[in-house]
A protein has these predicted regions:
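Preference for long, amphipathic alpha-helical scaffolds in soluble/luminal domains
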Residues: 614-736
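An acidic, Ser/Thr-enriched
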Residues: 63-104, 117, 126-285, 448, ...
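N-terminal, polar/Ser/Thr-rich
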Residues: 1-28, 730
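Short, charged loop segments at secondary-structure junctions
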Residues: 86-97, 248-250, 283-304, 314-324, ...
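Von Willebrand factor A/integrin I-like adhesion domains
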Residues: 352-358, 371-374, 424-468, 579, ...
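Proline/serine/threonine-rich low-complexity linkers at boundaries of modular beta-sandwich domains
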Residues: 10-15, 461-469, 473-476
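Short, solvent-exposed loop/turn segments enriched in Ser/Thr/Gly
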Residues: 31-35, 569
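Asparagine-centered strand-capping/turn motif at beta-strand->loop junctions
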Residues: 24, 38-45, 53-55
Length: 736
């Protein structure tokens, strides 16, 4: 509401942040983002204001500037401690100052400080970033502007110097006291087929008849009430490309920016495996913290996070291959396991797991994922069954880097597939644990269904890994390439691979070209992709490729302000400052040095409220303040624990010819647990070997009578097994 004192929070405190304006420029698969925060001090006293906000983990923030009453002030990137010292000195000397920094514990949380904002003053703070856009399974490029920064659980660790520890106020999305606007321009030489969004956008306006450029914008009056998602479909996305960008040798004679840089984008034509992997140890780590009781999104009738996760877990359990091993862990402030150790996948163990799934609730307190991860990694490996870890979480944790480091330390013995559930899930955590352990990450929000994404990940886990990946260059004499990207260890069919390199030496004449090769092996076969490209670098005032290359390097080396190894901290700091890309070790600082006179009067603090999802406030005490004992519980007595190499004791193995037991899931129970999703209901009745019992439950879900089903089954099948329908549906192929 607008009152004479300005926009107010529920505490009747004026809010100096008036609006957020975002300009988005997408060229091919790279997004350039310019976000402007408009402040105005409508009070009679000078202000110091704080604003904590989310950004995507992949964003390379390279510019920060302030326009104060028409005067532009460009910030400098400094070592973080030095930047803080400059800011505190400026404030104490009554100078206007502006500070932008990445949180010390997570690279997807930022804090903006505005110090000594004079009464009546207006300031526009603009930060610029670039990022690669991920490719969805259906060929869409996905851009997300994070809006929601939900409270992060702090656990028992010490996070007093986190941005989130400033205790900035939170408000429901509908009560946000500032407005939001966004304008986007998209261009591609291959042509734009369509643009979709989860938010109300203006009709797409194509610029030119060839549809290589288009513009869209959020409709007027949009409330920043959800993450803004754009899906961009080009006519062709699987063409490999190489882009070469000019360096800046005059201004950086010895730095990272001196030489030209190259960005190589491969789309390897990886063939389908001749025989999928049927072995493996599949461990599902399910978030059961209080925040999982929140809805996935702000939308009406949005599914609760825990219910969506349970529904997805059922599909995954139904899709495992007979003979593999599996287990399910739930975690919060404490954790629980379905079985004392991973058990062999049979009809009986599957049904036991499904009974446990139905009982799962978001009742385990805070989001403490580190301990169950360590427990899982301590378990001895099962010979011939490599570990595949599936993590489902809303990511509301503070110690992001500690968790990523734990996964990274165990990367050689497993692959990790991660799923961020709901608005506000930490992109730093979800992307980070998948990246360091050779898996993939997915985000599920709004109407977006989790099942198809989870099943795609399972299908990838069942494929043999691409091995012996290498990138090599064929360049003219006198020119060499220095790789900047971390070594890629795993590739999956349909995935894109982006690598960066610096080109040093003498650049050849205009007509010269180079080649780059991607080589790998799959099931003993040697495969190769190659791209020929022009060696004439193109100028870019924003040095987009250099900064994306720097971000790729920083992602691999920067493990947080406190946790980055000493041997890497020096390189992180140098690369960050050379390229102007923010890191955990640096911060942007700007001081209004030409202010005519010091700011007068006592300084008053104002914290800009940040949005939370509807429903989060009701469970916040449950998962922010909970301190349950850290104890592992099991539903089995020690005497019944199987060894790691034996079958689950007391339960017959289907491969020995035993028929599966009659399923204990009825049609009515399916409808109660899984609503009107008939596909999920159908899969819930499926046996471990892929068959169904021909009974009234199956007939009811299919909308047929039992007599109709029996009539449709071939006579030979009925003669062999009158109670089962042996036609298997591969759930891994559903909706992919």
């Amino acid at each position: 509401m607008v009152l004479p004192g300005g926009l107010l929070t529920r505490k009747e405190e004026p809010v100096p942040l008036k609006s957020i304006c975002v300009t988005l420029s997408i060229r091919e698969f790279v997004a350039g983002v310019s976000a402007t925060l408009n402040y105005e001090n409508e009070e009679d006293v000078p202000l110091e204001t704080f604003f904590v906000f989310p950004m995507d983990d992949d964003s390379a923030v390279y510019s920060f500037e302030a326009v104060v009453d028409g005067k532009k002030i460009k910030a400098e990137l400094q070592e973080k401690r030095k930047a803080h010292s400059i800011y505190e000195s400026a404030i104490s000397n009554r100078r206007q100052a502006f500070l932008l920094e990445e949180d010390k514990y997570s690279r997807d949380v930022f804090c903006c400080n505005v110090g000594n904002l004079n009464p009546g003053s207006k300031v526009a703070l603009t930060l610029k970033s670039v990022q690669e856009l991920p490719l969805e399974a259906d060929g869409a490029l996905r851009y997300v502007l994070p809006a929601v920064l939900n409270p992060r659980y702090r656990g028992s660790g010490s996070f007093e110097d986190s941005c989130l520890d400033m205790k900035t106020p939170v408000v429901p999305l509908e009560d946000l006291p500032y407005t939001f606007s966004m304008f986007a321009t998209i261009s591609s030489q291959h042509g734009i087929e369509r643009i979709q969004s989860n938010c109300p956008f203006s009709p797409t306006e194509y610029l030119g008849e060839d549809k290589t450029s288009a513009q869209v914008s959020l409709t007027d009056g949009h409330k920043f009430d959800r993450d803004v998602e754009l899906l961009i479909y080009y006519s062709e996305v699987h063409t490999p490309t190489v882009a070469v960008e000019m360096g800046q040798p005059k201004d950086n004679p010895d730095g990272f920016m001196k030489d030209p840089s190259a960005m190589v984008c491969f789309y390897p034509n990886i063939p389908e495996a001749q025989s999928p992997v049927i072995c493996g140890e599949f461990v599902f780590l399910m978030d059961r913290s209080g925040s999982m009781q929140c809805p996935i999104s702000k939308q009406d009738k949005s599914q609760l996070r825990i219910e969506a996760a349970k529904e997805t877990l059922l599909l995954l359990l139904k899709s495992l291959p007979i003979g593999c091993y599996f287990n399910v862990y739930g975690f919060g402030s404490s954790y629980e396991a379905f079985f004392p150790n991973s058990v062999q996948y049979t009809q009986q163990t599957m049904e036991e797991a499904l009974r446990r799934v139905k009982l799962m609730q978001a009742d385990l307190g805070g989001t403490e994922i580190l301990t169950p991860l360590q427990i899982i990694y301590r378990e001895p490996s099962i010979a011939g069954h490599p570990l595949q870890l599936f993590v489902f979480t809303d990511g509301e944790v503070t110690d992001t880097f500690n968790i990523i480091n734990e996964v990274k330390r165990n990367r050689l013995r497993h692959r990790c597939f991660s799923f961020g559930i709901g608005e506000g899930a930490s992109t730093s955590l979800i992307k980070g644990i998948a990246r360091v352990a050779g898996g993939t990450s997915e985000f599920i929000t709004g109407k977006d269904r989790m099942q198809s994404k989870a099943l795609r990940a399972l299908k990838r886990a069942l494929q043999p890994a691409v091995e012996d990946i290498s990138v090599s260059w064929d360049l003219p004499r006198g020119l060499s390439a220095k790789m900047l990207s971390p070594e890629q260890t795993v590739l999956y069919k349909g995935q894109r691979l982006i690598v960066y390199a610096l080109l040093s030496g003498t650049m050849p004449p205009v007509e010269a070209t180079g080649e780059v090769y991607l080589k790998y092996t799959l099931q003993g076969k040697n495969l190769e992709n190659r791209v020929t490209f022009s060696l004439q670098p193109k100028p870019d005032d924003n040095f987009t490729i250099h900064r994306l290359a720097a971000k790729s390097f920083l992602r691999a080396k920067d493990m947080g302000f406190r946790d980055t190894p000493a041997k890497d901290k020096k390189d992180v700091l140098k690369i960050s400052i050379d390229c102007g890309v923010i890191s955990s070790q640096t911060a942007f600082i700007a001081v209004h040095k030409n202010l005519n006179k010091p700011v007068q009067g006592p300084l008053t603090r104002r914290d800009v409220p940040r949005p939370v999802l509807l429903g989060a406030a009701s469970v916040m005490p449950q998962y922010l303040g909970c301190a349950l004992p850290n104890a592992k519980s099991s539903y089995f007595s020690p005497a019944s624990q199987p060894t790691r190499t034996s079958r689950y004791e007391g339960m017959p193995d289907q491969r020995d010819g035993c028929k599966p037991c009659r399923p204990m899931v009825s049609k009515d129970l399916c409808a109660l647990v899984f609503g009107d999703n008939h596909l999920v209901q159908l899969i819930s009745l499926q046996n471990a070997d892929g068959s169904w019992y021909l009974d009234e439950n199956l007939a009811g879900i299919l909308g047929k009578s039992l007599e109709d089903l029996l009539a449709a089954v071939p006579v030979k099948i009925l003669e062999r097994e009158t109670m089962m329908w042996a036609s298997k549906v591969d759930t891994c192929d559903i909706d992919t």
